[in-house]
């Protein structure tokens, strides 16, 4: 039997919420500078364009290489490393499945993620990704968080009033935009903290 909730849908971020990067599990050949290069790359305007679907993977690697003065092959190696270190958050996934079953809520993913990476996740993590009723990736939408257009596009697709939707993200700036649009925003601080939020509303 399902219990009626005040909210009808949950929007979850993927990175650092549903999935985490566990660099302790990287192969022994992984150098610290690869991890540093990855972090620097992901903060770059070039990578943000890649996340919006404005660049191909090859173009992204080439332009990042030019801007960071490294060989594009090193950029590719850094991103391959990120894929290898990706781990799901089983406690969160179990809780979300429980919510879907007991409260009948819809669950969506909304993530700043390039087309190639979301397709990789759908293929390599199919069992985890099936928890979502729909996945909204910046690479296909053409905008990224915290850009308001991304939120409006997602809410238009969901078709619910903002106050009936919970938005969960690990970045406060993204949560602030959601709150400004009327959603119930939660900055992710762990599964138990999220459980307290969602079971209390």
From Swiss-Prot:
Which InterPro entries does this one have? HAD-like_sf (IPR036412), HAD-SF_hydro_IA (IPR006439), HAD_sf (IPR023214), PGP-like_dom2 (IPR023198)
Q: In which pathway does it act?
A: Secondary metabolite biosynthesis; terpenoid biosynthesis
Q: Does the keyword Hydrolase apply?
A: yes
One example of the protein's molecular function in GO is: phosphatase activity
* EC number(s) stated in the UniProt entry for this protein: 3.1.3.-
Kind of enzyme, top EC level?
A: hydrolase
Q: Which Pfam families match?
A: Hydrolase
Upregulation: Expression is regulated by the secondary metabolite regulator cclA.
Q: Which UniProt keywords apply?
A: Hydrolase
One GO term under biological process is:
terpenoid biosynthetic process
- Which reaction(s) does the protein catalyse, per the Swiss-Prot or TrEMBL entry? (S,S)-drim-8-en-11-yl diphosphate + H2O = (S,S)-drim-8-en-11-yl phosphate + phosphate + H(+)
Source species, domain of life: Eukaryota
Purpose of the protein? Sesquiterpene phosphatase; part of the gene cluster that mediates the biosynthesis of astellolides, drimane-type sesquiterpene esters that show antimicrobial, anti-inflammatory, and anti-tumor activities. The first step in astellolide biosynthesis is performed by the sesquiterpene cyclase astC that catalyzes the formation of drimanyl pyrophosphate from farnesyl pyrophosphate. Drimanyl pyrophosphate is then dephosphorylated by the sesquiterpene phosphatase astI to produce drimanyl monophosphate which is further dephosphorylated to drim-8-ene-11-ol by atsK.
Family membership, please give it: Belongs to the HAD-like hydrolase superfamily.
From the Swiss-Prot or TrEMBL record, give the protein name.
Sesquiterpene phosphatase astI
């Amino acid at each position: 039997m399902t219990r009626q909730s005040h909210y009808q849908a949950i929007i979850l971020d993927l990175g650092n919420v549903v999935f985490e990067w566990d660099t302790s599990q990287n192969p022994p050949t992984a150098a610290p500078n690869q991890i540093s290069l990855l972090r620097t790359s992901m903060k770059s305007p070039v990578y943000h364009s890649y996340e919006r679907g404005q660049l191909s993977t090859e173009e992204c690697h080439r332009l990042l290489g030019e801007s960071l003065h490294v060989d594009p092959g090193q950029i590719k190696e850094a991103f391959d490393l990120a894929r290898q270190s990706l781990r799901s958050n089983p406690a969160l996934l179990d809780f979300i499945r429980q919510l879907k079953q007991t409260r009948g809520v819809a669950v969506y993913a909304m993530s700043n993620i390039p087309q190639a990476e979301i397709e990789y996740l759908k293929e390599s993590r199919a069992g985890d990704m099936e928890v979502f009723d729909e996945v909204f990736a910046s690479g296909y939408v053409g905008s990224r968080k915290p850009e308001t257009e991304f939120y409006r596009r997602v809410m238009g697709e969901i078709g619910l009033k903002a106050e009936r939707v919970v938005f969960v993200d690990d970045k406060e700036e993204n949560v602030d935009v959601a709150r400004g649009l009327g959603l119930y925003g939660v900055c992710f601080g762990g599964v138990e903290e999220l459980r307290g939020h969602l079971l209390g509303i």
